[in-house]
Amino acid sequence: MERQNNDGGYTFCQYTDSSAEDTYFAVRTLKILGVEPKQKASTIKFLKSLQHKDGSFDSIKVAYYVVKTLNELGAKLEKSPKEFILSLKNPYGGFGSLNVDVEVSSEIESTYYSIEVLKSLNECINPNEIISFILSLKNFDGSFGKQGYSKIASTYYALASLNLLGYNTKSLNKTIEWIRKCESPRGGFNSNPYGFDTYMVIEDCYFGVKALEILDEVCKYPLQTLSLISKFQNGNGGFRRSIFLGISTLECTYYAVSTVKTILRKI
């Protein structure tokens, strides 16, 4: 609650402006913890203010965070962003660019966000073209990623998108095998099978556990993973990205809390 501003939005760094991203992660985390968000009316007003008059947003990420958080709070946008979302379609059948910055976790991320927003708005989606696009990014080892570059983030977003579109993800046996290779006996997941446990980050633990959940699988080392996640926690109660150093963020805290809840459900 310390990270909520007077406008109802949230920020991971006190005394800075609220953002859609931090507000989404804060509200989602509170829901997992069974805590009712404060100043709900102000939060809804803040989120709605992020939509432009023509229905668009600054990015698909902002649209996703706004729509999903409003859903959590029992509210809706005044104007549908459908046209904005459809304007992001790429020639390959997905959404957004395949050439993404290093800060973006996956080239499939925009497609996943777009599907989620359209489904949240009960808009009709033609799944076949999008499914073909996602499967075109499937590598020989079962992972997903452009030009054969496998990442657990891309594999998670691919599975989550396919699942939303009604594709039988449980038929992807090689994908399950690849994710298992990312799993460490000491707990957690690496970005790929060749990663080092030393450089493990909290979001890859989240992507690994959640990807297995989509496939009706569970992590092999739940207690070790829970122990590892505890090492990401700072003294202020929040979680950081690395086990070594870093400030707490609402995003990392959500990844940690959500991952823990998923694991505990299966034990």
Give, region by region, the residue ranges found by the protein language model.
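Long, well-ordered core segments of solenoidal/helical folds
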Residues: 1-9, 38-55, 76-96, 125-142, ...
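An alpha-helical repeat/solenoid feature that recognizes helix-turn-helix modules
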Residues: 12-37, 56-78, 96-126, 145-171, ...
